[in-house]
Every structure is written in C-alpha cells, then in structure tokens.
Amino acid sequence: MPETPSTLDRDTALLERLLGDVLVEQEGPAFRDRVFWLRERAAALRADPSAPDGDELVQAVRRLSSSDLGPVVRACSVQLQLSNIAEELERLRRRRAHDADDQGPQRESLAAAAAATAGIPQSRRAQALADLDVGLVMTAHPTEATRRSIFDHQQRVWALMEHLDDPRVGPTRRRALEDELREVLTVWWQTDDVRARRPRPDDEVRRTLLHVESVLYDAVPDFLAELESTLGVSLDDDRAPEGKGRGGRSGRVGRSPIGFGSWAGGDMDGNPNVGPETIAETLNRHRRTALRLLGERVDALAVFFSQADDRVFVTQELRASIERDERQLPRVTFPGASANEPFRRKLTFVAARLDRAAQGGEGGYAGVDELIADLELLRASCSSSRVAHGRITRLLAQARTFGFIVAALDVRQSAGPLQHATAHLIEGYADADEAGRQELLVAALSGPPSYVPEPEDEEARSTIAGIAAVGRAVADHGPEAIGRLIIAMARQPSDVLCTQFLLRHTAPDEHGATMRGVAPAVPIVPLFETVDDLEGAEATMGDLYATAPYAEHLQRCGGSQEIMLGYSDSAKDGGFIASQWGLYGAQERLVAQADAQGISVRFFHGRGGSTSRGGGPHHRAILSQPPGSVRGRIAITEQGETLSQRYPHPELAVRSLEQTVSAVVLATLTPAETPPDRYRSALDDLTRISRETYRALVFEDERFPRLLHQASPLAELSAMNIGSRPAKRGGTTGVDGLRAIPWVFSWMQNRLLLPAWYGTGTALEQGDRDLQREMVEGWPFFRTIVSMLEMSLFKSDLGVAERYLELVDDDVRALWEPIRAEHERVQSVVLEIRGTPELLDRTPALQRRLAHRNPWIDPLSHIQVALLRRSREGDENAQGPLLSTIGGIAAGMRNTG
C-alpha cells in the first residue's frame, strides 16, 4: 500500500511545533528561532549544494560558544527522535489501513506466504510449521545510545500520538492531549541525554528485558494466533520434534515456533565486567521477571474466570487436580472464590504455586511444564466453548514461549582465553601444535576425570569460573536457562574441544561438587568471524564430527549442530562483498557436509544494525540465503539498537515477527535455486577485486588509521557512557584490534559509511553490466547485495563527510581523493544496474523518509566537526555537547553500528 505523506508530514509538523513551544518556554524565543534557522539553512543547502547557505551554516556554528551549542544539539537530537516516532506511527497506520481495506495480502506477511505456497500439499505445509524453530537473540548493543529515561519519555509520546490519531478525538480532548505532549517534552528536555556513568551489565539486562515486558510478551500470542489461522494448521500438533521450543533448547510440553534469547549479562568476550556472578544474577532476574509476568496474567485470568460449576463442563481430571491442590496447599485461601467456581479455584492454586516457585518454597512449580499441564487441564474443560480459544490460549502461548526464564541466556567467550585456561589444566598443552592439542583433549574427554589443582594464573581462573557458571545455571534453572555457549573467533577444532573439556571439568554434581565427569548438555557454538575463518569452517567442523567425545556431546544436545556466522568482523576484515560471498559459500559447504553425515545444522546469523554489519530487513536477508540452509530453522541476533525500531509497539512487533517467520516458511517450502556457474564466477571476481581494493586502503596504507581517528569521533567514543564493553580488544590501536561495532559507528558518525561500500565500485565497474542486471533479477542473494549498497550510498553524504577533513593531517587528507572517486564509482554502477536516475527511486516512500531527516542531522554534523576541533585543542566545555552530537546523529541515522 502506498504511504500517505499527509499523515506523516502532519505528525512531524505537529511534533516540531510542540517542541518549538517547549523551547520557547525553556530557552526563549531567540533560541527556538536559532534552532529552526539552522534547520532551514541545512535544507536549503540540500536543495542547492552550491548556494551560500553552507558557509552561513558553518560560520553560524563557529560563532557560537561550546556552551551555547549544547542546547542546539539537544534540540536537533530530540526532534530527530520525535521524527522516528512519527515514522513508526505511520508504519502502524499503514498496517491497520491495509487490514481494513482488504486489498489482498500485505507484502512480507504470513498471508502472502500462505498465498505463495497455496499449491503445496497441506501435509507439507503442516510439517513446515511443525519444524519451525526461529530463535531471536537480543543483544545489549555496546554503542546503543538511548538512555532508559529517554526511552520511557519516547514511549509516552508514542502513546499520546496514538490517541491523537483516533478520529473520534474532538477539539477539547485534542487540546488536552497536546498539553500532555508538551508536558512530556518539557520533562524530556530537562533530562540529561548522556548517561552520568557507563552502564553496568545489570543495566543492560534490565533494558533488554524491558522490550520483552513492554511489547513482546503480549505481542507473541497475537502473532502465534495469526500464524495458526493464516497457515491453517495448529501449533498443538504433536508432530513437533522432541525438545522443540525456545530455539530448540527446551523439552517442555507443547512448543512455540519462536524463542527468545539474550546476550546481556552473559557476553564475556572482551568484557571484564561480565563474569560468573553476573551470569547468576542475570538468570535470577530473568526468572523473577518470568514468574512475575505469568503471575500477573494468572491473577487477571482468575478475576475473569467466574463461571459457576453448574453452568460449565468440568473434566474429572480438573476436579482431581483441584482436590490434589487442596491436599498439598491447605493454607491457600480463596477471597472472592466460592466452592462452586472451579476455574477460579484452580487458578488461585496456580497463582499460589507460581508464588512459591518465585520464593523457592515448598509446593511451587518445579518447572514450566507443570504450569502448562495445569493450564491445559483448564482449557480442556473449556473445550466446548469459545473460552478455550481466548485468554487461556494466550497464557499458554506465553508460558510455552517465555517459560520460567523469559529468554535463554547465551554465554560467549573468545577462543583465546578458553585455550589459555586449558593450557593451565592439561600438561603439555601450551607447547603442542593443533594436532597435538586435539589428541590431548580427546584423551582427557575420553578417560575418567582426574583432579587438577586450580591454576594460579588469574586470567585462567577467571575463564574457568565463567564456564563453571554455565554448569551451575543449568543445575539451578534447568536446561532452558542457557541457550548456547558461543566461542568467539573460533578457528580450529581445539577451540571447541577445549570448551567441551572446560564444561566437563567444571560440571557440578547433585551436591554442587565439580568433576562429575559429564559436561552439561549445553550446545557449544563456534562463531566463525573473519573471511579466512569462514573458508576454514568446513574443515574445522569435519574434524569435530569425526571426534567421538564431541559426537557424543552433540547427541546429548539433541543431535543438531548450531554454527554462528559473524557478519561484523568478516566485513571489517575483507569488505562488504567479500564478507557476504564468504558467508554464502560457508553455509553451502557446511550444509552439504552435515547432510552427508546425517547431522542437522542450524545457522545463527550474527547480524548488526548497519548494512556493513549484515543489517537490514530480516525478510529479504532470509530469502537470500543459500538453498537448504534454512529448512525451518534459523537464529538471528536482534541488536540492542534495533529492538526499539523493530518492536516499538505490540502491533508493529507482530508485523516484524511475521516478516521474519514468513521468510523462513518461504525459504523452507520454496527455496531459492542454486545459482549457475556464471553467477558464481562473477561473484568470485567481485570478491577478489573488492577485497584487494578494500584492504589496500584499510590495512596496507599506513595513513589510514590516522584518517579513522582524526576524521571521526572514535577516540571520543571511549568517553561516552554508551556500553559496558571496551571498544577495543586488548591494547592495540590499529584497525585490527578495533571491535567491529565502534569501527562501523565511527564511519556512520562522519556520514561516510565507508565499510559498507568501499571497494565495491572498482569491482562492479570491471564486471559485465548485463550479467549484473540479470543477477539482480534472478538471484535473491545478489539483489540483496545491490539493495544494501543502494541504501548505504543514499545514507552516506560526501559533502558532509568532507567537512571532517578539516581535522586531519595534510598527508592524510590525500586519501580523500581515492575515497571520493570510489564512492562516485560505486554509485554510478549501482544506478546503471538499477536503471534509475537517483538512488532509491524504486522505493520513493523510503527515499522520502530518509531524506526528511537530513535537515536535522546536517547541523549536528557541522557542530560535531567544530566541537571535535575545540575538544582536541583543550576546550573542556566542548566535551558534553560533543557527546550529545554522537547520540543525536545515531538517532537520525537510525544506526549506531
């Protein structure tokens, strides 16, 4: 359905007007006029880059003191966040209008997937739904730049704008709602937008759970109901494989085709702030949250279920269950629930058992399976009426999806510390080569456990304690507590085997002692990150599959191997196209290898928010995966920066979930065809040329690290309290040691977005243009590459980026010419392939939305350049407003990294 510009423009204009009112009240009319004058100059410069407005804008910024620039930055940043809210409300409006107009299935919807697979036998469609296993893993983005307090104010604006959108609202109520908006905007304006301290892991845990509590917990039942009704099959079908649910980690009664995980509080990779205590505290918080959410809904259901005994059918099983509860929980009282209200009586016992489970008291539920069994007894008694398909079915969906843990905690550690710890436990390990290490590990895993004194090395002790926390978590909370143990920078079989050894070494027995001799059944997931590691993944996994102790561990974990693919570091290592093609080829080889050995494999895609980190719409990305690589099973990271974009409202959360799951259904039932050899040859050439071009600049030109540090706020990021994890690995200062996220963040800030496109122009220019157009039309993978390039080019801005050259050394400035030429080259080729005069001409609604933000982002960029110069010259007053420009540009670009 085409976008309705009038409603989006109306909302944006309203929010601009209301913010202007607040600025007048708080800072005076002259300040408001200054802010909007800067916006108008930026808009005029966009319309005519040769106009004098650019110099006027720069001179106006230079005339203002650093202290005076601070409030200007705040105003632009708040308006950009308000514009984002207006865009999200427009998405919601379009979804509702589409449903009301009944104009056929919406693009990327479950209904569209059902229509596309209508010719497939119902039995196959039912089996595809039974096989669905979609894991969405939330991460605490290290550069997620929105404070919790600001997030809360954004939610209030969202709700008030939604009320204003109701056509039944009259003039009096409208004025009252606008006054409420002014009040919220006033408090927002008076709130610091930069944290007073760097967030701790527990802050990130709370923020991650907030998205579940406020949106996802109630959106999931709606989505699952839509999934069943649209595809015409039941999620209660007993053909679901053993252990399905929560991304394949739970053996609960019933199942959910989607499951949620989290890295917040469990990601130890390079983060000294996460350790065994953090893991334990995080899971305790997860459990408390899960039981509270379930308890609140059971209490509400008990109030609602007031049916009298003589007016409903009550199964003998339910009556027996109530009698059993009365014997086991004799002290439970029934305020307002009489003996002739069996459903309410049962739900009172359910609430009591949940409360006891939360308190660790006698009589509480041992696990969520027991709760589900009780709810199923209630639903069976309601089976003859519509009551069975309402609130109780919603509660069952929530119990099956979120369980007693809300989201399984993933634990991640880098291969280096794991190997270092193992070397302190196995004699001769440190000096052995890879073959020798594998031999030592197989011997240690095959024989009985032996006592090894705790090492004196502090790093080794810390790593061992972190792995021990995994075993304790499973013992304390059950297998659903830990989603997976991820090995970052995995390169060789010993990286996985040493992790298995450490799991076994620290495994607790029923008394809490270690050395039980059997590692907990926690999936060990290698994360292949660089281009070279992706190429070597097949050999690594082949050796592991052939290793008896690991094969046994795999069987105890359900017989399925999960492999994580790193988009961020592979792109930093080899450039955009080399990363994408390397990931594609690795999946093809790993699927063929697993199929040959009868092993089921699921890929965990570590996508970021930006294009250069694999970001973009899930639907398109899933459909571009190699044939046979999905088969109903996939896991995807949901970066902290994108959670509020994908799940800002329950209805939009349903839309995001259906876009993801519908793509999995389509990729399973109608997989893409294997690309012909001429396509492969073309991609091989593109990869080789683009990687050589990219690395020649990024890794081989000694001036490049200075360009990165001088022409971006990379150094200043370390002072900004926007993540619990350091920006660099170890103490290195070059590109190699820089984490992929701040690497991308820096190029997003200076508007160049270099990692997303550099090298691709040279490669594409040398290719066959007719073949490239054919590939765009006939190959989803290449079509996605071109679409992502087009988006990145549109978001980049060489005119703004060139302003940052004022900050660099003279010899470094010489790098600008090849960068500018490559940008022009790739843009020219993309337009030739697309056959359009301008970028994003085929998606005018998106083009208009992105362009609409620029007049508010551009002043921030000019101010950032001025403040970077002043800060580096020693102006202490520049630091605060400078950090605010970082958050404002991130909000406007809708990406941090």
Which role does the model predict for each range below?
Residues 708-897:
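C-terminal accessory/interaction regions of large nucleic acid-associated machines
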Residues 1-4, 21, 58, 194-209, ...:
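Glycine- and acidic
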Residues 119-122, 146, 162, 167-192, ...:
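Structured alpha-helical segments in the cores of large, soluble enzyme domains
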Residues 335, 339, 345-346, 404-497, ...:
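Active-site cores of enzymes that catalyze phosphoryl transfer or operate on phosphate-rich substrates
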Residues 274-303, 506-692:
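Catalytic or ion-translocation cores adjacent to nucleophile or general acid/base/metal-coordination motifs
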Residues 255-257, 261-263, 271, 396-397, ...:
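Beta-sheet entry/capping signal
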Residues 18-22, 38-41, 79, 215, ...:
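Generic, well-ordered alpha-helical scaffold segments in large soluble proteins
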